[in-house]
Regions:
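Core register positions within helices of long alpha-helical scaffolds
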Residues: 196, 246-250, 341, 348, ...
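Extended glycan-interaction surfaces of carbohydrate-active proteins
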Residues: 141-184, 209-233, 283-330, 363-448, ...
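TPR repeat positional signature
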Residues: 244-247, 335, 342, 453
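Single conserved hydrophobic/aromatic residue that forms the stacking wall/gate
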Residues: 1-5, 10-12
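Acidic/polar, glycine-enriched structural segments that form the non-catalytic walls/loops
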Residues: 19-183, 258-259, 268-271, 275, ...
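Aromatic/His-enriched, Gly/Pro-containing loop or helix-boundary segments
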Residues: 6, 219-241, 245-259, 500-503
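Alpha-helical support elements that line or immediately flank enzyme active sites
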Residues: 183-216, 394-405, 453-466
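Extended, well-ordered alpha-helical scaffold segments
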Residues: 108-129, 145-152, 201-214, 257-275, ...
Length: 522
């Protein structure tokens, strides 16, 4: 991008050359001197000038360095610096680096002079990396405006890629770099990111999964979210089980049986955990819950923090454990996910030639949760088995996981195609749009979340409704505000308007847009 002043136009470009270093290239239309300085240093930061580098040290041991070529005149001023480039020859190259320790900084600073003096190989590698991503993603039969959506989705995912640091023992993808509270790794977010990146960066996809399993509990539980500071991790709840799907996507694109073998025991342990600590009445149908007995954490475990279906829920202690609590309702989406996990675990066990030894209730889920009174999938109350008739996005999951019967899906079509309920301006909201509790800005009580919209669209495709699935896909692509233009991809959107709502630059929306793009017309 460029900065235009009254007498000068400055253009700069930033390219990552490694996980820790970005190369800043600066050009201007005159030969006037350039003066650089820092601003807004944190109060705990100590700034020093050492040889050709400005080093900003944090008490934690982390450092940021800004390294110049030898012809730049560096000076320290108070707790700041100046860098003067006299009669510059363009481009001016500057290396900006982040290191987690003094040792790491010392080892890497010695590599920067060669980068600054001859950046061409690193820039070529960067260009080839991006070309590789896009070659694997882009189709030859899509309109340019839809290709732009796919490129924007890839760019969003890669811009949210973070290297290992502190308590994050593997690299991975954060939900959004633009929002301070989204700078960790979440479980079901990570499964989506890995499924979305498996096609164009499978190694990143693998490490994203490994990062969450670094904190697998002794009983098999995968905790909700992890941070660079492990004291901030949330182990009160898990998240919906989609990880076997992510592993299978990686296997589909790589054929990497070694990765399947690495993950299988951990996947099996996590799958068993659900039936051990989230099946209150031991009937094979699980509930969302928490380790601490709070409804807040149990709702977080569903991933749908304030969903209308949980408005009347209460918590029940599960017999035999101090850290096992369930909501008093069995959830259709959870058990549909578990049915898919079971199917894929069986696939993996066959691939690895080892017996599958875990509960299998997958054949019972669809009939158990199908409410014939309204021809829709619903959660059920534990106390009497009655259905919680608040039709919502959880009903899309049996279609996506392919456990519904064709007759069930056919009978759902009138409600799914009702423009007052689910066939809205942007299709497939989190709750039927005519529900009295529907809130257009209510997070999981009305807005569009693109994972759920994807589950519905792919679900229709799974049962032969391809033309309808394509129509809904184009509604998403054409109607979401700014999607085909320059606006960032957001966390969720307005059901009746397509307006951008919560966090921008959102990874899981990007993953599912890539999936819609890939599925269209197939």
């Amino acid at each position: 991008y460029g900065l235009v002043g009254s007498e000068m136009c400055i253009r700069d470009r930033l390219n990552f050359t490694s996980a820790s270093t970005a190369l800043l290239r600066i050009e201007a239309d005159t030969a006037e001197d350039l003066l650089f300085s820092g601003s807004q240093w944190g109060k705990d930061i100590t700034v020093s000038v050492e040889q050709n580098s400005v080093i900003a040290r944090h008490p934690s041991g982390e450092t940021v360095t800004v390294t110049f070529t030898p012809n730049v005149e560096l000076a320290k001023t108070d707790n700041n610096y100046t860098a003067l480039v006299r009669s510059p020859r363009y481009p001016v190259n500057v290396a900006i680096s982040f290191f987690t320790s003094e040792k790491e900084m010392t080892a890497n600073l010695q590599n920067l002079p060669s980068l600054l003096n001859n950046p061409a190989p690193a820039l070529q590698a960067n260009a080839e990396r991006w070309e590789g991503y896009l070659t694997k993603i882009l189709r030859k039969d899509m309109k340019p405006e839809y290709d732009r959506i796919a490129v924007k989705a890839v760019t969003t995912l890669i811009s949210n890629w973070r290297t290992h640091r502190g308590g994050l023992l593997h690299e991975g993808i954060i939900p959004s770099h633009a929002v301070g509270y989204f700078v960790g790794f979440w479980a079901w977010d990570s499964w989506r990111f890995s499924a979305g990146t498996a096609k164009f960066d499978p190694e990143l996809a693998k490490n994203n999964i490994r990062a969450m399993f670094d904190y697998q509990q002794p009983d098999g539980m995968i905790i909700d979210c992890i941070y660079t500071d492990p004291s901030e991790n949330n182990a009160r709840d898990s998240k919906p089980p989609l990880v076997c799907w992510a592993v299978d996507e990686i296997f589909t694109h790589t054929g990497d049986t070694a990765f399947v073998a690495e993950m299988y025991p951990q996947l099996l342990s996590y799958y068993r955990w659900w039936y051990e600590k989230r099946d209150h009445n031991r009937n094979g149908m699980c509930e969302y819950g928490a380790t601490d007995g709070t409804l807040e954490a149990a709702a977080w475990e569903s991933g749908m923090d304030n969903a209308i279906r949980f408005d009347g829920a209460v918590m029940l202690k599960n017999e035999g454990y101090e850290d096992a609590w369930s909501m008093d309702q069995e959830s259709v989406d959870l058990n549909a996910y578990l049915a898919l996990e079971c199917k894929l675990l069986k696939k993996f066990s066959s691939l690895l030639k080892i017996p599958f030894d875990a509960p299998d209730y997958s054949s019972q889920v669809a009939d158990y949760f199908f409410d014939k009174n309204i021809n829709f999938f619903c959660d059920r109350r534990l106390k009497d088995g009655s259905f919680i008739e608040e039709p919502g996005c959880e009903a899309y999951t049996p279609l996506w996981t392919r456990i519904a019967t064709q007759a069930q899906v056919d009978s759902m079509l009138p409600m799914l195609q009702d423009t007052a309920k689910f066939s809205t301006y942007i299709p497939f909201p989190t709750i039927a749009a005519d529900n009295p509790k529907y809130n257009p800005r209510g997070y999981w009580r009305g807005p569009i979340w693109l994972d759920q919209t994807y589950f519905a669209i792919r679900g229709l495709r799974n049962y032969g409704y391809n033309r309808l699935a394509d129509e809904y896909t184009l509604q998403v692509f054409d109607r979401l505000s700014g999607l085909k233009e320059g606006a960032p991809i957001h966390e969720n959107y307005g059901t009746h308007t397509g307006e951008r709502l919560k966090a921008p630059h959102f990874s899981w929306s990007s993953s599912h847009l890539l999936m819609m793009y890939d599925d269209y017309g197939k």
